[in-house]
Amino acid sequence: MATFKDACFHYRRLTALNRRLCNIGANSICMPVPDAKIKGWCLECCQIADLTHCYGCSLPHVCKWCVQNRRCFLDNEPHLLKLRTVKHPITKDKLQCIIDLYNIIFPINDKVIRKFERMIKQRKCRNQYKIEWYNHLLLPITLNAAAFKFDENNLYYVFGLYEKSVSDIYAPYRIVNFINEFDKLLLDDINFTRMSNLPIELRNHYAKKYFQLSRLPSSKLKQIYFSDFTKETVIFNTYTKTPGRSIYRNVTEFNWRDELELYSDLKNDKNKLIAAMMTSKYTRFYAHDNNFGRLKMTIFELGHHCQPNYVASNHPGNASDIQYCKWCNIKYFLSKIDWRIRDMYNLLMEFIKDCYKSNVNVGHCSSVENIYPLIKRLIWSLFTNHMDQTIEEVFNHMSPVSVEGTNVIMLILGLNISLYNEIKRTLNVDSIPMVLNLNEFSSIVKSISSKWYNVDELDKLPMSIKSTEELIEMKNSGTLTEEFELLISNSEDDNE
């Protein structure tokens, strides 16, 4: 039995604030939703279940019951999941606020116990203090939290009562314990005070549960990667040929400077929180999905589908436009891919083709060449530390000759105007040289790969990890989405 889930079910009848805060999806009707085949703790009801992705952050951290409430720990609506969320760094004041939250929402005193006795004693079998009927009173205050590590300084902690154990190797979070950052003896005293109000039959169960959960060791934090995010919220814009992501958040017009001000209103101005929850709107943000994680994933898929036979072919068109050649056709893959990746693939394959055919005697695209595996490796090594080594291996497979102690290759350029301009810009020359050394060859390859992507300025993870306040600010400034003109043609001569 999930104690936190039971506590939300019973305590929601205490106050007007509890009726809104403790209304979780796990205590309502189940709606069929696909799960992510990941077992873990649902952050909203704290029970172990099959997790599904959240519509707010695209990470699997809610169960199929709670996902219907559409709540995320990154919302700015002060629902219970948001109130249990604290951003790094953790301070003693923030931990004290979490303890005050438990005491306000889930109090244990004589008045509350008498009320639950009247509610529960409906038949003779419920007259005794059985755990089955009073499990919601066995809610100890612990400082365990599910930690999300987006970056070294971008961490979120969702506090809750995470009972039992489960292999969370595939979950995006790890359970950490902050009892040492607070005060172990002080937390014991707070729980002993709560326990003293319980009937004698329930005290041992409360104490056992508290000491088991409050002394748990912290797990090593897990770095969240792009592969942890679901593909269900990704939308491909067929007009701009760019991927985007739908982000849904609960947005309220009320603002708080930090968590401490929010918890202050929880204690002193409960009507403000009720008004914020009543006036919140479920808002959709459409954001671009241009980040380093997606770039690496797309490059890996491109290397898998790449057709290196193109470098030995006599096709006059771009590599992405070849459709009826079984050795060079890749159009099936590039039809729904970012146009920047498509342009990079065209220029890179055209450049290697011109260099290779200028130095090696080859036949046509059905030929078997030793350079083919290297071209796949070259694409896979883009934006990695192995890029220079792979470029040198590709260069050495083009039969370079030594001129005055420097290995060079010939370059007889084709009719690709985009490649012509790119080489001129990279080498900063007025006319294209017919001889290239390794440094020039490497500079051109790197320039083509980084033509549309500045890796240093790319975010590592999707926009769905941004807070709601950041998303609103970016939407108002127009930086939430990217708009590009369609690439109709590289040259007007292509249609002639």
From Swiss-Prot:
Localization per Swiss-Prot or TrEMBL: Host cytoplasm, Host cytoskeleton
InterPro entries, per database record: Rotavirus_NSP1
Pfam families the record matches: Rota_NS53
BP-aspect Gene Ontology terms: symbiont-mediated suppression of host cytoplasmic pattern recognition receptor signaling pathway via inhibition of IRF3 activity; symbiont-mediated suppression of host cytoplasmic pattern recognition receptor signaling pathway via inhibition of IRF7 activity
Any one annotated GO CC term: host cell cytoplasm
Residue ranges of the region described as RNA-binding: 1-81
UniProt keyword Metal-binding present: yes
Keyword vocabulary terms for this entry: Host cytoplasm, Host cytoskeleton, Host-virus interaction, Inhibition of host innate immune response by virus, Inhibition of host IRF3 by virus, Inhibition of host IRF7 by virus, Inhibition of host RLR pathway by virus, Interferon antiviral system evasion, Metal-binding, RNA-binding, Viral immunoevasion
Chain residue ranges for the region called Important for cytoskeleton localization: 82-177
Disulfide bonds: none
Region span, Interaction with host IRF3: 321-496
Sequence segments annotated as region (Zinc-binding domain): 42-79
Consequence when changing F484A: Abolished interaction with host IRF3
GO MF entries: metal ion binding; RNA binding
Outcome after substituting L486A: Abolished interaction with host IRF3
Motif (pLxIS motif): 486-489
Subunit (UniProt): Interacts (via C-terminus pLxIS motif) with host IRF3; this interaction leads to IRF3 degradation. Interacts with host IRF7; this interaction leads to IRF7 degradation. Interacts with host CUL1 and CUL3.
Role according to the record: Plays a role in the inhibition of host innate immunity by inducing the degradation of key host factors required to activate interferon production such as IRF3, IRF5 or IRF7. Associates with components of cullin RING ligases (CRLs) including CUL1 or CUL3, which are essential multisubunit ubiquitination complexes, to modulate their activities.
Annotated family: Belongs to the rotavirus NSP1 family.
Domain notes per entry: The pLxIS motif targets host IRF3 for degradation; however phosphorylation of NSP1 pLxIS motif is not required for its activity.
Protein name (Swiss-Prot/TrEMBL): Non-structural protein 1
Organism listed in the record: Rotavirus A (strain RVA/SA11-4F/G3P6[1]) (RV-A)
